[in-house]
């Protein structure tokens, strides 16, 4: 797969006239690397004035959420059940080292980095690799040890993938999707479904309910209000929002 620059944050070095941002174009996640092997195809994309787009990383299977460390960028592959550590050692905006640091995971989608540690999620579990960048810089062989944070999450795979992130309160926020397209009974059986939750001292608490399938959220930098995207019901047709 081909990874295209995402919108997480502006790059620190803005010497060039063109603003470069880390920007993942969701549509590109479903194309093979060969689809963008010819850079001329990138010209088919419409960009705002003053922006450029270029291939940032290749040969990553279905990359999903991205998180930035101090020296590395981390992403997850749901289809392969893997976590990747990416590095751009010469700062040319092209990844030159791509390493798998966890595998054999159950539909891993979510990753987040905090205080030197990398957290990542399966459908029903959340793990952490402590001091991950120092481990990578020490050129260790194999894979780093991962520590289980929780396995107390529903294991239903329908909308079971987890996007994760720490909030301004330093608590870990995790959406739990509805295990269906449209349903009520399943939600009554387990109140965690169709919600956004946060981990507070080892216990889960609800932040929002009635959230069918959130695959992205963040906080307002000033008010600290939580904003999230929610995927609505499927199969309404081309003329109705979903």
Model regions and ranges:
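Cleavable N-terminal signal peptides
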Residues: 24-25, 35
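Beta-propeller domains with acidic blade repeats across secreted/periplasmic ectodomains
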Residues: 37-242
């Amino acid at each position: 797969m081909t990874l295209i620059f995402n919108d997480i944050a502006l790059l620190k070095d803005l010497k060039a006239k063109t603003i470069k941002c880390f920007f993942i174009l969701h549509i590109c996640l479903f194309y093979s690397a060969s689809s963008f092997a010819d850079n001329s195809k990138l010209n088919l994309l419409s960009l705002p004035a003053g922006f450029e787009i270029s291939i940032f990383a290749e040969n990553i299977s279905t990359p999903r959420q991205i998180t930035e460390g101090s020296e590395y960028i981390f992403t997850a592959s749901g289809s392969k059940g893997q976590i990747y550590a990416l590095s751009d050692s010469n700062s040319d905006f092209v990844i030159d080292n791509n390493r798998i640091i966890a595998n054999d995971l159950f539909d891993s989608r979510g990753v987040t980095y905090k205080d030197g540690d990398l957290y990542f999620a399966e459908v029903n579990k959340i793990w952490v690799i402590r001091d991950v960048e120092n481990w990578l810089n020490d050129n260790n062989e194999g894979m780093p040890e991962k520590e289980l944070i929780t396995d107390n999450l529903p294991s239903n795979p329908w909308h079971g993938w987890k996007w994760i992130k720490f909030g301004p309160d330093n608590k870990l926020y995790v959406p739990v999707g509805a295990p269906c397209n449209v349903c009520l009974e399943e939600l009554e059986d387990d109140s965690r479904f169709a919600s956004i939750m946060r981990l507070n001292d080892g216990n889960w608490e609800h932040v929002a309910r009635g959230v069918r399938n959130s695959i992205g959220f963040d906080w307002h930098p000033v008010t600290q209000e939580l904003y999230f995207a929610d995927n609505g019901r499927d199969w309404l047709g081309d003329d109705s929002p979903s």
